[in-house]
Curated annotation (Swiss-Prot):
One of its GO terms (biological process) is signal transduction. Phosphorylated by alpha subunit. PANTHER family: CASEIN KINASE II SUBUNIT BETA. It comes from Schizosaccharomyces pombe (strain 972 / ATCC 24843) (Fission yeast). Keywords: Phosphoprotein. Belongs to the casein kinase 2 subunit beta family. SUPFAM superfamilies: Casein kinase II beta subunit. GO terms for molecular function: protein kinase regulator activity; protein serine/threonine kinase inhibitor activity. This is Casein kinase II subunit beta-2. Signal peptide: none annotated. Pfam families: CK_II_beta. The keyword Transmembrane does not apply. PROSITE patterns: CK2_BETA (PS01101).
Length: 254
């Protein structure tokens, strides 16, 4: 089987990694598999360049088959991939398989497991540590004052969209600036994660800690450009917040 046909899923993705270059960037250095190294597959995967967004999923989470419900239908060579992730596979037992294919399936499977893991209490805590350290980067918008961002997906299905970065200050999505992250699938983080994260860790929400919700106001010779103008500002309400939502809710209840 050729490298360009490595990823073959049961659904019909709109975005696939169909070229050799794309496959090489996403699944780099397959030949350096941990099968012959004194390191777990999970640690090896997360330590590779470009995998900084990922956390190490606990093996007991993966061994609980309830957490893997339905993934056998989404990943080819599911059993072999799962054995590889859990280091239950010896090199000589895979002689009849194309190791590139098994490695690719294992990485897809791990990504989908990762999506489910990071919305658990333990997974959220691990991601919170990375977020606090700024591992995921900062918002490129000037008025967001270097607010830390979180990885997010637009879909929970593999192959739909690459990973994006969600800014909790301007509530917008941005593509990663580094090319090493452009082929990470968005489903490996999912659409739920960033919003559940800030519900679980409200103290990390920048809207509650730093006053950086500025909105750019276009001006000509010092005068504000009207919103009715063709070149005027658009949809500024998207970045406007209530000063004290708590007091508003109390007044409504009265």
């Amino acid at each position: 089987m050729s490298r360009k046909n490595l990823i073959k899923l049961n659904h019909d993705p709109t975005v696939t990694y169909s070229t050799k270059d794309d496959a090489d960037e996403l699944f780099d250095d397959l030949s350096s598999s941990p099968l012959h190294e004194n390191v777990s597959w999970i640690s090896w995967f997360c330590s590779r360049p470009g995998r900084e967004y990922f956390v190490e999923v606990k093996e007991d989470f993966i061994e609980d088959l309830f957490n893997l419900t339905g993934l056998n239908l989404a990943v080819p060579f599911y059993n072999e991939a799962l054995d590889l992730i859990l280091d239950r596979t010896a090199p000589d037992t895979l002689e009849n398989f194309d190791m590139d294919v098994i490695e690719t399936s294992a990485q897809i499977l791990y990504g989908l497991i990762h999506q489910r893991y990071i919305i658990t209490r333990t997974g959220l805590h691990q991601m919170a540590e990375k977020y606090s350290m700024g591992i995921f980067g900062c918002c490129p918008r000037v008025n967001c004052c270097y607010t830390h961002v979180l990885p997010a997906g637009l879909s929970d299905i593999v192959g739909k969209m690459p990973v994006m970065l969600f800014c909790p200050n301007c509530l917008d999505l941005y593509a990663p600036s580094s090319s090493r992250y452009k082929n990470i699938d968005g489903s490996f983080f999912g659409a739920t994660f960033p919003h559940l994260f800030f519900e679980s860790y409200p103290e990390l929400n920048p809207k509650r800690s730093i006053p950086c919700g500025k909105i750019y106001q276009p001006r000509i010779y010092g005068f504000k450009v009207s919103e009715l103008s063709k070149t005027g500002p658009r949809m500024q309400w998207l970045r406007m917040y209530l000063e004290d939502s708590g007091s508003d809710s109390e007044s409504e209840s009265d």
